[in-house]
Amino acid sequence: MRFLSTDMKDRNMLFAAITTNQPIRSKCSRLPDLHDFFPTNISQNFAITPNLDITPTPERIAGVTIVLQIEEYLGQNESEQGAVNLARTVLGARHRNGETWQGILEDIRAGGGMDNFIQNLPGAYPETPLDQFAIIPIIDLHVGNFYLSFTNEVLYMLLTVVLVVFLFFVVTKKGGGKSVPNAWQSLVELIYDFVLNLVNEQIGGLSGNVKQKFFPRISVTFTFSLFRNPQGMIPFSFTVTSHFLITLALSFSIFIGITIVGFQRHGLHFFSFLLPAGVPLPLAPFLVLLELISYCFRALSLGIRLFANMMAGHSLVKILSGFAWTMLFLNNIFYFIGDLGPLFIVLALTGLELGVAISQAHVSTISICIYLNDATNLHQNESFHN
């Protein structure tokens, strides 16, 4: 079972052979027994079994070289072991069905290399609950060295704007609402009264006219959060607030705006917010540092809370919905548990996540009102609430 051939070239030719269009040139002087070249797992995956009629033809030598190169390349992707094992199985099946290793390699090269081959294998990368948060480019735009694209994230943000504007336009057209409100007008009035009560309750020490200056901005923030958060509950849609950069940009812009309001109202005296009255002088530097860190972390906490709740909630619904879908196909004596139980689970989780999405808009708005109250009243908040 041993025969002579020429020396094998360096295995670095693997990358060139698979990812480029360079032809394979194999010069071998000695080819060991095929079991030396192919360990048990390789010979099983690629179905390389020596028989009594093997002769050292150039075609067989080239085929062995190609298989070794493919296996060495696959071995470099241990982090994607599941996809690599699937690739081995597919390649072995194609060879057993009559394709030559040279033809398989040419097909891999024509398809863009081994990376593309693995990625395009059906089932190589199973769908995960986090796939629903993937940002997918719809229209690619290149401006010089800048890469701009119209993505699904931008699309759903625009849809939210259009939906809110259309809702308020329908309610306020023809000079105002009806004396007997319909369902849409009742919804808008409910949002208006809800946000107005939050502003009046949470922001103290200001006249009604001054509070009205903050009301439109807070109302817009609440309305867009209210319509934006539950979007992910619609099948095949996208949750904008499930991305940390979006919520962080929103929270930082609000944080900067509130800080500007504080300086406009108090000037440099706004820094007294960092040092409560009556603090002993030795503790002042320590407390100023703590208050500064606490104040700056408000921007992070506002964004992280919304992002974490949306992402965790929607992921949980995805996971348990997949489990429920599997249970629906179980046919056994436990009919109620196997068929009706998962349906109730999905309905309950959907209602729960819908409530969480709406409540997060409420919590974010309350937090904004509290931060604005702190910036406008400084340390007078305690006396106001008392």
From Swiss-Prot:
**Record keywords: Ligase included?**
no
Q: Give the membrane topology, semicolon-separated if more than one.
A: Multi-pass membrane protein
Which GO cellular component term is one of those annotated? Answer: mitochondrial inner membrane
Transmembrane stretches, by residue range? 150-170, 243-263, 270-290, 310-330
- This protein is called ATP synthase subunit a
Which GO-annotated molecular functions does the record name? proton transmembrane transporter activity
Q: Report the protein's function.
A: Mitochondrial membrane ATP synthase (F(1)F(0) ATP synthase or Complex V) produces ATP from ADP in the presence of a proton gradient across the membrane which is generated by electron transport complexes of the respiratory chain. F-type ATPases consist of two structural domains, F(1) - containing the extramembraneous catalytic core and F(0) - containing the membrane proton channel, linked together by a central stalk and a peripheral stalk. During catalysis, ATP synthesis in the catalytic domain of F(1) is coupled via a rotary mechanism of the central stalk subunits to proton translocation.
Q: Which NCBIfam families match?
A: ATP_synt_6_or_A, PRK05815.2-4
Q: Which PROSITE patterns match?
A: ATPASE_A
Q: Which family does it belong to?
A: Belongs to the ATPase A chain family.
